[in-house]
Curated annotation (Swiss-Prot):
GO terms for molecular function: betaine-aldehyde dehydrogenase (NAD+) activity; choline dehydrogenase activity; flavin adenine dinucleotide binding. HAMAP family: Choline_dehydrogen (MF_00750). It catalyses: choline + A = betaine aldehyde + AH2; betaine aldehyde + NAD(+) + H2O = glycine betaine + NADH + 2 H(+). One of its GO terms (biological process) is glycine betaine biosynthetic process from choline. This is Oxygen-dependent choline dehydrogenase. The active site is at residue 475. Involved in the biosynthesis of the osmoprotectant glycine betaine. Catalyzes the oxidation of choline to betaine aldehyde and betaine aldehyde to glycine betaine at the same rate. Keywords: FAD, Flavoprotein, NAD, Oxidoreductase. Pathway: Amine and polyamine biosynthesis; betaine biosynthesis via choline pathway; betaine aldehyde from choline (cytochrome c reductase route): step 1/1. The keyword Nucleotidyltransferase does not apply. It comes from Pseudomonas putida (strain GB-1). FAD binds at residues 6-35.
């Protein structure tokens, strides 16, 4: 006998936990929240310590560890595509960079038919609703939300300040808040970390206040098999628990909400019979609704590192040495302070590489150590690096289910670097980064260029380095996009076109990828749509001012000119 709820939410990630918390604020509403992973164990430093952010990517307890098909423009590499597994979803394993995107991203969404209420000023109140910033609220930031946001503090690593100053010396603006009036420029970077130095996942921020409500049922280790339909209406789901092959059925009186992320949401729809007819028929899946955009329009951010030796012993290199780690861990565990309490991404920036870009097309994260994002290939000396990536690539990929089996990973292809714009942006980005790194502010610290290496100069040499070393920034999105065109999957409220009682609410419904990290925006989307589901009036539009570059020059004259090939 199946259980029955008002709403079934598939996926307890950044969006799913937000929705579950908001929907169950109405005491008469019952919600079933299904999560394929396990709990977010609060004593597991791998997910709770900000500085340990690389650890969850190295195993499969908290990571789906997807891989792409061979990427044709990246020497056929199968690229890593980590996604969070467990309460919190990818907010449980991400880099904790609290970046919202550029105001022009959302104004661009709102220019699309059917998305008129997605302007930046419509979205800003929901960013504020979700946030508690440690230095207090203002026109751009909240003070009472579930997501704890920490700002960089005086006394942090001197390399952060030097790298921001170098960006300004190279001719770019200085900004005091990458989520405030002006994103463009270099400045301190906020992070999703609590005042006690713990990761602020949506499991901690949202579910901690909701999980004891009698109208919320949370089932972990529950892998959703498919959505059940009565004609074109979603009426429930079947799921597997643990290693069992027995299907458990749950029924939804009102809606099934798919919040499984940009990889798994389109895969679940396809397995359930909602997607491109030819694909479904090739997998012997009965077609419930032919919807060609399901799994298409896939987008991501690609990035690479420029690494330098550090001539002063101020980098985090000693923290990589095992004999120093117990003391770091103890300070974090008992005091919530020290190196362990930060993700160490405390400075960054956004720039335009050419005048045709009307808002930034390159993002920087600065890190005071030289190491891969997943913790591999740490340079065995003092060093620092700039993560540099393009923001709005024209490349488009796709997600395709391979079978009806929910345990089989889908076919994933991003088509990285498939357009000439991609190559131009990365070549420009590397050369501009070298100019930034050559500025006087970094003279006390800058040693040799470790990667790519000073001898890598020509377009051909740079292209080879990009093909071999560029990596995902772990920002898959847009694979069930909002809109009204033939390839749109959902409307501006997340309702699946042609269906009843079925929504998708997560990063997959972004029509176009944003300029920056995705987590804060994914939470905002869920906050905004939760009001739609509950029949509440939207929050009043913000009246905050925001920067538009217009005809402003891309950059000023650098303090130090650098000759490059």
């Amino acid at each position: 006998m199946s259980q029955e709820f008002d709403y079934i939410i598939v996926g307890a990630g950044s969006a799913g936990n937000t929705l579950a918390t908001r929907l169950t604020e109405d005491a008469g509403v019952t919600v079933l929240l299904l999560e394929a992973g396990g709990p977010d164990y609060r004593f597991d430093f791998r997910t709770q310590m900000p500085a340990a952010l690389a650890f969850p990517l190295q195993g499969r307890r908290y990571n789906w560890a997807y891989e792409t098909d061979p990427e044709p423009h990246m020497d056929g590499r199968r690229m890593e595509c980590g996604r969070g597994k467990g309460l919190g979803g990818s907010s449980l394993i991400n880099g904790m960079c609290y970046i919202r995107g550029n105001a022009m991203d959302f104004d661009g969404w709102a220019e699309l038919p059917g998305l008129q209420d997605w302007t930046y000023l419509d979205c800003l109140p929901y960013f504020r609703k979700a946030e508690t910033r440690d230095i207090g609220p203002n026109d751009y930031h909240g003070g009472e939300g579930p997501v704890s946001v920490a700002t960089p503090k005086a006394g942090n690593n001197p390399l952060f300040h030097a790298m921001v100053e170098a960006g300004v010396q190279a001719g770019y603006p200085r900004t005091e808040d990458l989520n405030g009036y002006q994103q463009e420029g270099f400045g301190p970077m906020d992070r999703s970390v609590t005042k006690n130095g713990r990761r602020s996942s949506t499991a901690r921020g949202y579910l901690d206040q909701a999980k004891k409500r009698p109208n919320l049922t949370i089932v972990t280790h529950a892998l959703s098999d498919r959505v059940l339909f009565d004609g074109k209406r979603a009426v429930g789901v079947t799921y597997l628990v643990g290693d069992s092959e027995e299907r458990v059925e749950a029924r939804a009186r009102k809606e099934v909400i798919v919040s499984s992320g940009a990889i798994a949401s389109p895969q679940l729809l396809q397995r359930s019979g909602v997607g491109p007819r030819a694909l479904l028929e090739s997998l012997d899946i009965p077609v419930v609704h032919d919807l060609p955009g399901v799994g298409e329009n896939l987008q991501d951010h690609l990035e690479l590192y420029l690494q330098y030796a550090c001539t002063q012993p101020v980098s985090l290199y000693p923290s990589l040495l095992w004999w120093n780690q117990p003391a770091i861990g103890a300070e974090w565990m008992f005091k919530g302070t020290g190196i362990g309490a930060s993700n160490q991404f405390e400075a960054g920036g956004f720039i335009r590489t050419r005048p045709e870009f009307k808002w930034p097309n390159i993002q920087y994260h600065f890190l005071p150590v030289a190491i891969n994002y997943n913790g591999s290939n740490g340079v065995k000396e003092h060093g620092f690096q700039a993560h540099m990536g393009s923001m709005r690539s024209p490349a488009r990929g796709r997600i395709q289910a391979k079978s009806k089996d929910p345990r089989q990973h889908p076919s994933i292809l991003f088509n990285y670097m498939s357009t000439e714009q991609d190559w131009q942006e990365f070549r420009d980005g590397i050369r501009l980064t070298r100019e930034i790194m050559a500025q006087p502010a970094l003279d006390p610290y800058r040693g040799r260029e470790i990667s790519p290496g000073a001898d890598v100069q020509t377009d051909e040499q740079l292209d080879k380095f990009i093909r071999e070393h560029a990596e995902t920034a772990f920002h898959p999105s847009c694979s069930c996009k909002m809109g009204t065109d033939d390839m749109a999957v959902v409307d501006g409220e997340g309702r699946v076109h042609g269906m009843k009682g079925l929504r998708v609410v997560d990063a997959s419904i972004m029509p176009l990828i944003i300029t920056g990290n995705l987590n804060a925006t994914t939470i905002m989307i869920a906050e905004k749509i939760s009001d739609k589901i509950r029949g509440r009036k939207p929050l009043p539009r913000s009246t905050a001012k925001y920067y538009v570059a217009g005809d402003a020059p891309v950059k000023g004259k650098p303090m130090r000119e650098v000759k490059q090939a």
